[in-house]
Design a protein with these regions (language model features):
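ABC-family P-loop ATPase nucleotide-binding domain
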Residues: 1-14, 303-320
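Short alpha-helical segments used as structural interaction elements across diverse proteins
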Residues: 2, 10, 52, 163-165, ...
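Hydrophobic (often cysteine-bearing) scaffold residues that line and stabilize catalytic clefts
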Residues: 4, 216, 220, 290
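A residue-level signal for beta-strand positions that form part of recognition/binding surfaces
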Residues: 5, 71, 146, 271, ...
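ABC ATP-binding cassette signature C-motif
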Residues: 13-19, 23-260, 314-320
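Alpha-helical coupling/stalk and coiled-coil linker elements that connect catalytic or binding modules
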Residues: 127, 271-279, 310-315
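Intracellular alpha-helical coupling/juxtamembrane segments of multi-pass membrane proteins
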Residues: 248-297, 301
Length: 320
């Protein structure tokens, strides 16, 4: 099995030419990595995911995925599939496979089925087989059962479901068919602890690219291999799970603050020397040298995080 890399090149999204949701973001997200994107409400996470999934266009830059690779996104519109059965909703998660099946069914249903139709149907059948289509319904039913949708519900209409069950069906749809890139926005919402545990195990064994946004710190600790921290429209990457990111980001801020403190002390010392000896002929050269040192001294502006609290992920009481 070949795997796909998602490439993000110089991505910027601005609104009204002023407000930046994302600013010059470039990175490659490789297979077998689960990357979570963190940030306060309004930091640009949702905009970023919409651009990655093709639902929004960036102001500049681009997102590329190898031709023929499939991206699957956890649907946020809980009414989008109300006219379909639960099982069909999941099968529609693999759009190309579903369209091939529909085309084959339409050919076989023709009252004037011709030899040409037979050849075309045969060709489609080969592609369908290569995609695992003949096992698709069984795979979809298994996925539904894994997320807590009982077998006797699989042929119900989506419109008949409560919202908490729609969430599970749409999660099964996103996971169905082994997509090359999987984008999950708040995947643990409305899930019980057993289903979350199953999802954690599923993702731990997943060999393709996963991108996730979640407020469930426990979930992020369990599944993430990388963290992307969106703050002030910029992206900082960390290797590790949520807890590692939190510790590393706090340490980095502390180290920058300590370096700034030393630089400020050095600046004060140089300024005092220059003020004291700049008019002293004997010390003029030393004063000039210190002036050059002062000009080169770099004191980084450290902004406080744009979050209300250092960590945007809050503790959640998981359902039993």
């Amino acid at each position: 099995m070949t795997t796909a890399k998602l490439v993000i090149d110089n991505l910027t999204k601005s609104f009204d030419g002023q407000h930046l949701a994302n600013n010059h973001i470039s990175l490659e997200i490789s297979p077998a990595k689960i990357t979570a994107f963190l940030g306060h409400n309004g930091a640009g996470k949702s905009t970023f995911l919409k651009i990655l999934s093709g639902k929004q266009e960036p102001t500049t830059g681009n997102v590329s995925l190898e031709t023929g690779k499939r991206m699957s996104v956890l649907e946020q519109d809980h009414f989008a599939y109300d006219q379909f059965t639960i099982l069909e909703t999941v099968l529609r998660g693999n759009k190309k496979m579903f369209e091939i099946k529909e085309e084959m069914d339409a050919l076989y249903a023709k009252p004037d089925f011709s030899d040409e139709d037979g050849i075309k149907a045969g060709e489609l059948g080969v592609i369908y087989d290569e995609m695992g289509g003949w096992n698709a319904e069984t795979d979809a039913q298994t996925m539904l059962s894994n997320v807590g949708i009982k077998e006797d519900m699989h042929y119900q209409m989506m419109s008949e479901l409560e919202n908490k069950d729609k969430v599970r069906v749409l999660l099964a749809q996103a996971l169905f068919g082994n997509p090359d890139v999987l984008i999950l926005d708040e995947p643990t919402n409305d899930l019980d602890i057993d289903t979350i545990a199953w999802l954690e195990d599923f993702l731990a064994d997943y060999e393709n690219t996963v991108i996730v946004v979640s407020h469930d710190r426990h979930f992020l600790d369990a599944v993430c291999t990388h963290i992307g921290d969106l703050d002030y429209s910029k992206l900082n990457l960390y290797t590790g799970n949520y807890s590692y990111w939190y510790q590393a980001s706090q340490l980095a801020t502390k180290q920058r603050a300590q370096a700034n403190k030393k630089a400020e002390e050095k600046k004060k010392e140089l300024q005092e020397f220059i003020a004291r000896f700049s008019s002293n002929v004997a010390k003029a050269k030393q004063a000039t040298a210190r002036k050059k040192m002062l000009d080169k001294l770099n004191i980084e502006e450290i902004k406080p995080t744009s979050r209300r609290y250092p960590a945007i992920i809050f503790d959640m009481e998981r359902e039993a």
